[in-house]
Amino acid sequence: MNQAVIVAAKRTAFGKYGGTLKHLEPEQLLKPLFQHFKEKYPEVISKIDDVVLGNVVGNGGNIARKALLEAGLKDSIPGVTIDRQCGSGLESVQYACRMIQAGAGKVYIAGGVESTSRAPWKIKRPHSVYETALPEFYERASFAPEMSDPSMIQGAENVAKMYDVSRELQDEFAYRSHQLTAENVKNGNISQEILPITVKGEIFNTDESLKSHIPKDNFGRFKPVIKGGTVTAANSCMKNDGAVLLLIMEKDMAYELGFEHGLLFKDGVTVGVDSNFPGIGPVPAISNLLKRNQLTIENIEVIEINEAFSAQVVACQQALNISNTQLNIWGGALASGHPYGASGAQLVTRLFYMFDKETMIASMGIGGGLGNAALFTRF
C-alpha cells in the first residue's frame, strides 16, 4: 500500500462572524492559500490529481472546483466538495490520503473553508404552488430525525449532564484554551500556521475570537444560553470565517521533490453515536482507532479534539483518560474559532507544525451523532 504524507499546510487567520472577513465568499477566502501554494511549489501544482475540500454552509455549487479556478489553477484539475458537517475538513484530508494509499493518485490538495458570515439564507419551499403565507426562514438543515436533532447547544448540555461536567469545569477549560492560545501566539507557534492576507488594504493575520485579556473570574459571569443549563457564550466556540489548505502526496514522490518533513497518515476512523449526544463522538472514534493500531492512549503524544464546547471536550478527556499534557496543548477553537468545514483541516495543520511530536491524533465530534479521528506520525 502506498503511503500518504502531508508536506505543507497553511490557513488564513479566522475571522469572527460579521468580522473582518465578512464580505468574502468561500472561494475568495481560499484564493490566497491556493496562490501561495502555486507560487511556492510550482513543480507540484502541475501534478495535482484532485482538490478535496470540506464545507458546510457555503454558497452552493462545487466550492472546491470554483475555488481552484478562481485562484487561476489549470482547468484540467478537478475538485470535489465534501460535507460531513463540522468534520468535513478532517474528512477531506483522510479522503485524499486514502486515495493515495489506494493508488488512485499521487498529489492532492485538501482542506476546508467556511464563511458563516456569507452563508445563504434558507427558505423552506411551500407544499402548495399557490402558497400565500410568508416564507419560513431557518438557521440550519436538520442533522437527524426531529426527535433526535437537538440544537448544538442542547447537545452540549446533554453531554454535560450525562458525563457530569460542571459549569466550573467548563469555564476552567475555556479559560485554559484562551491562555494556551495566547501563549502560543506570543511565542510564534501559531503564526507558523497562518498565511497573512490583505483585506481592504490591511494585513489580517490574527484570529479574531481570542480573548486572552478576560480574567478567569469573568467566565463565571456569563449566563447560560438555556435556562438552568451550564453552557454559555464563554465556554462555547464562536461562529467563524476562514480557510485551510494542505498539500498531500505519495511519500516516495515527496522525497523525490525534496520534502524532508511532515506528517505520515496512518489510519482514520469514523463512527456513529446517539445524535442527542454529538459531542461525545471522539470517544468511540479514538478508542476504535487505538485498538485497530494496537496502541494505548499513553502512546499518543498529542491529541487535538475540536473545541466546539468545553462540555464535550472535557467529557471526552475524562472518558478517554487524556492528560492535560496531551490535549490541545496550543489551545483550540474556543479561542481561535470554529469555521465549521475548515476546523478539521485546522487540527491537522496544527499537528503539522508540532515538529517535536511523533505520534498524534486529530478528532472531531460532529452534528448528527458522528465521531471522526485520524492518526498521524512524523516522517
UniProtKB/Swiss-Prot annotation:
One of its GO terms (molecular function) is acetyl-CoA C-acyltransferase activity. InterPro entries: Thiolase, Thiolase-like, Thiolase-like_sf_Thiolase, Thiolase_C, Thiolase_CS, Thiolase_N. The active site is at 86 (acyl-thioester intermediate), 338 (proton acceptor). Its EC number is 2.3.1.-. It is an enzyme of class 2 (transferase). GO terms for cellular component: cytoplasm. Keywords: Acyltransferase, Transferase. GO terms for biological process: fatty acid beta-oxidation; phenylacetate catabolic process. The keyword Acetylation does not apply. NCBIfam families: AcCoA-C-Actrans (TIGR01930). May contribute to vancomycin resistance. Belongs to the thiolase-like superfamily. Thiolase family. This is Putative acetyl-CoA C-acetyltransferase VraB. It comes from Staphylococcus aureus (strain Mu50 / ATCC 700699). The lineage of its organism: Bacteria, Bacillati, Bacillota, Bacilli, Bacillales.
